[in-house]
């Protein structure tokens, strides 16, 4: 495959995902005007929205990074394609107010989670096969071990949203526990995982800017508070949920602020945005920070549902 073809394929993947997101906005606005059948469907749609944001992040990130790797392994074409399918399924689910799962959407999201898990295994293998094996140097400069985890999370959020739609409106259950509690634990674990990846990459960057400490402090605290709110006894539930909700809003804002910081990092490189074709690959990854926002918004939906379980 020629370099021109690779460029066209990468740009087409990102453009298709962006166009799909814009096209779906009309349906999402119309859906908000209509009362949802139940809070469990509203929570499912919120998880679909979080899944969509994560899938868009993976689509852009994997297309860029695998292009930078010249698609050396043909399996490197799979993540952008699967992420695009997951994005479409998540956006469709976000606009769907029916209290019933969609088989195709569910299958796509399960496929996305499986692809992300397989990608994580491939990336870990890439790290360990290098001279020195599992070392800090290889974790810093080998295939990013945590990157495919975002696709796992996108698929998991989307699949859980489909499963939740099949539950009864009153007292829905997931994994043998109240649905709100289960959703909060899943979102909290996702926040902790993404914070760990940010910690590794920001440590590699020597925390050159004070703002680089924000994702490794605010985000894990948000994940811990969300888990605490899910597990808190009834007498402490209201206070725990209120504080967790406030912190998750801060985390959601941090994700979009991080996008701005990363864009500024690209602009500060030699040539700035005029040299975008080089600096986008050499600078901080633009698609990474919104994953915090996606999981924080999912966590807020879980807390709203958790309130009905008291």
Identify the meaning behind each predicted range.
Residues 1-310:
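Short amphipathic, positively biased membrane-proximal segments
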């Amino acid at each position: 495959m020629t370099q021109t073809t690779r460029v066209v394929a990468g740009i087409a993947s990102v453009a298709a995902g962006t166009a799909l997101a814009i096209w779906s906005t009309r349906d999402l606005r119309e859906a908000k005007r209509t009362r949802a059948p139940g809070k469990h469907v509203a929570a499912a749609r919120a998880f679909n929205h979080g899944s969509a944001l994560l899938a868009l992040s993976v689509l852009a990130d994997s297309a860029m990074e695998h292009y930078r790797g010249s698609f050396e392994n043909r399996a490197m074409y799979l993540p952008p394609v699967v992420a695009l399918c997951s994005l479409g399924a998540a956006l469709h689910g976000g606009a769907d107010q029916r209290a019933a799962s969609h088989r195709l959407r569910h299958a796509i999201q399960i496929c996305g989670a499986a692809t992300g898990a397989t990608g994580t295994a491939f990336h870990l293998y890439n790290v360990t096969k290098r001279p020195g094996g599992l070392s800090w140097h290889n974790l810093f400069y080998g295939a990013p071990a945590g990157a495919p985890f975002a696709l796992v999370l996108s698929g998991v959020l989307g699949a859980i949203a489909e499963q939740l739609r099949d539950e009864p409106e009153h007292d829905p259950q997931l994994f043998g526990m109240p649905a709100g509690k289960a959703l909060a634990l899943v979102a909290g674990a996702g926040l902790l995982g993404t914070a760990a990846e940010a910690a590794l990459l920001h440590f590699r960057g020597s925390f050159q800017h004070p703002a680089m400490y924000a994702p490794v402090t605010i985000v894990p605290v948000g994940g811990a508070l969300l888990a605490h709110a899910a597990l808190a006894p009834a007498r402490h539930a209201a206070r725990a949920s209120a504080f967790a909700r406030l912190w998750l809003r801060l985390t959601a804002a941090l994700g979009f602020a991080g996008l701005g910081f990363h864009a500024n990092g690209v602009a500060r490189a030699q040539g700035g945005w005029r040299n975008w074709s080089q600096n986008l690959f050499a600078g901080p990854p633009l698609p990474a920070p919104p994953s915090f926002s996606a999981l924080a918004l999912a966590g807020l939906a879980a807390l709203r549902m958790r309130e009905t379980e008291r």
